[in-house]
């Protein structure tokens, strides 16, 4: 890739957790978004569906025509919880962008039937070309008044 030596890479403008997200024509359509705590009855807990809405800002000086955007779920110790990260190959606009401008990349990631073994902190690590650029943290907790899970 022909990147300028002083170029700043892509940055995350928006990253949020939601019940559902669609990315259509440069817009995020979000249902039940912006939460940071997932309440469950007991552990282990299987959550039917959650999503991430993401807007990445890419400077025109980035110099690449493609980038790999990935999201990996990790527990509090940094151990991955998915067999592999979810990834999108993103084609970037050609030379039609004026110099010194940025452009946005809008994407959504949906995760179905995630299993959370225990209460605690989790995070989605967002990476560009296998380099982490952001971390979206959340907690999974038992609802108050629910009996504790056997350990």
Predicted regions and their residues:
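Contiguous segments within soluble domain cores/interaction surfaces
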Residues: 2-119, 123-128, 132-151
């Amino acid at each position: 890739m022909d990147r300028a030596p002083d170029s700043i890479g892509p940055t995350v403008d928006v990253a949020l957790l939601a019940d559902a997200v669609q990315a259509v024509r440069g817009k995020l359509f979000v249902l039940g978004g912006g939460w940071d705590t997932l309440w469950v009855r007991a552990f282990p807990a299987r959550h039917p569906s959650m999503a991430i809405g993401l807007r990445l800002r890419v400077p025109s000086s980035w110099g690449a025509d493609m980038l790999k955007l990935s999201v990996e779920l990790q527990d509090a110790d940094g151990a991955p919880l998915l067999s592999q990260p979810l990834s999108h190959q993103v084609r970037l606009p050609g030379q039609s962008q004026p110099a010194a401008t940025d452009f946005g990349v809008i994407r959504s990631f949906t995760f179905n039937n995630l299993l959370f073994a225990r209460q605690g902190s989790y995070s989605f690590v967002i990476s560009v070309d296998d380099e982490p650029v952001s971390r979206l943290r959340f907690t999974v907790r038992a609802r108050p008044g629910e009996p504790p899970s056997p350990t």
